[in-house]
Amino acid sequence: MHENTFDCFIAHAGIFDEEALYYTTEEMWFADWDNGGLGRGYLSGSPWSEYPEAVRHYAHDPKLNVEKWNTPILCFHGGMDFRIPYTQGMAAFNCAQMMGVPSKLVVFPQENHWILQPQNALYWHRTYFDWLERWMK
């Protein structure tokens, strides 16, 4: 997909399935605005929207390109993230594993969209830099 452009990926609260996210996020304004609705009102950025921006947005959904994945990926997620549920990171990790792509999933059960507890933030940063050190050429 990226034709060896990147040595590795790191996704914090990453989105794997845009359509599923549309139905599961706690903040619908973001779902409509970010998905191509551009302030036209609720449902304007929905998966069934006919606005060209929304159609283009969903055409680039990561889940549609799993068969092209070959870059190692580290996925971080907060277990209490209601903006982007942790199952998005789990889905990306599971697909990477099924594709034989080196991958790691780190879920902080007591954290939300941000990793705020000091011990967790320290672990996040250590894991982040360890991943880069491992895969950067």
Task: Specify the residue positions occupied by each region the protein language model found.
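Active-site-proximal cap/loop segments of hydrolase catalytic domains
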Residues: 1-137
